[in-house]
UniProtKB/Swiss-Prot annotation:
Assigned GO CC terms: cytosol
Family: Belongs to the UPP synthase family.
Residues annotated as the enzyme's active site: D37, N85
Cofactor needs: Mg(2+)
Biological process annotations from GO: polyprenol biosynthetic process
Keywords on record: Magnesium, Metal-binding, Transferase
Binding-site residues for substrate, renumbered to this chain: 38-42, 50, 54, 82-84, 86, 88, 205, 211-213
Name of protein: Isoprenyl transferase
Entry function: Catalyzes the condensation of isopentenyl diphosphate (IPP) with allylic pyrophosphates generating different type of terpenoids.
Residues that coordinate or bind Mg(2+): D37, E224
Binding partners and assembly: Homodimer.
Cofactor binding, note field: Binds 2 magnesium ions per subunit.
This protein's encoding gene: uppS
EC number, UniProt record: 2.5.1.-
Length: 257
């Protein structure tokens, strides 16, 4: 890991004015979650249709996946499509749901080569067959990879997730499989869509907006939040590395002193 980190640091300092002299390879956030925001405003400011922003944003995904893998981050969760996104214009929704297929068709060989494991967090209900096929194929072909977990939050909403978890738990109580007094935080976590993942250490939201948009509300209770005033299509590896540096300069207390 240290050798890999040293190579990254040299590449970084060769291309950027600011040297990350204080970054600690032993204190890398294990799980980074990102709300990829600002595609539409990026396009509007350039006089382009919103889908042009989403297309450009897909290029940013490539950069950040590589950056996360280089830093040996264990999990990268990307908020790709929320349950609220269905309310957008039909043409935009159709384009957004084609992006996973386009991305995976183009990048799956590289993801396999770089030992990345693809996972999905969200409801499959309502997703088009071409999206499901692309995601399922990627999950199957990368399931034995042991490097970065690339977790796509697709058709995901935290309130829906929590409601579903409560329904599952209530059913177990009703059937006598679980006593109400035995329900713990761990019980709830085990019934969430993210039950196969540790909670995020760092949550990044781009575009400067200061809200969580129904994203992993249970899981980010003790995450460090970083709201960055840059649209997602303009978000670079440099921004990502600066986010990691900011995380390392904070003291995580988990509710303590």
């Amino acid at each position: 890991m240290l050798e890999r980190f040293s190579k990254w640091r040299q590449a970084f300092t060769d291309t950027e004015d600011e040297e990350p002299t204080s970054i600690d390879p032993q204190n890398i956030p294990r799980h980074v979650a990102i709300i990829m925001d600002g595609n539409g405003r990026w396009a509007k400011e350039k006089g382009l249709p919103r889908i042009a922003g989403h297309r450009e944003g897909m290029k940013t995904v490539n950069k950040i996946v590589r950056a996360a893998n280089t830093l040996n981050i264990e999990i990268l969760t990307l908020y790709a499509f929320s349950t609220e996104n269905w309310k957008r214009p039909k043409a935009e929704v159709e384009f957004l749901l084609k992006l996973p297929e386009r991305y995976l068709k183009s990048e799956l060989p590289t993801l396999i080569e770089e030992n990345v494991q693809v996972r999905l967090m969200g409801s499959k209900d309502g997703l088009p067959s071409y999206t499901l096929h692309a995601v399922d194929e990627a999950i199957e072909k990368t399931k034995h990879n042991t490097g970065l977990i690339l977790n796509f939050a697709l058709n995901y909403g935290s309130r829906f997730e929590l409601t579903s978890a409560m329904q599952q738990i209530a059913k177990k109580v009703q059937q006598g499989e679980l006593m109400p007094e035995h329900i713990t935080e761990e019980t709830i976590s085990a019934h969430l869509m993210s039950n196969h993942l540790r909670d995020p250490d760092l949550l990044i939201r781009t575009s400067g907006e200061l809200r969580l948009s129904n994203f992993m509300l249970w899981q980010i209770a003790y995450s460090e939040f970083l709201f960055m005033d840059v649209y997602w299509p303009n978000f670079t590896e440099h921004h990502f590395y600066k986010a990691v540096l900011t995380y390392q300069n904070r003291g995580r207390r988990y509710g303590g002193v």
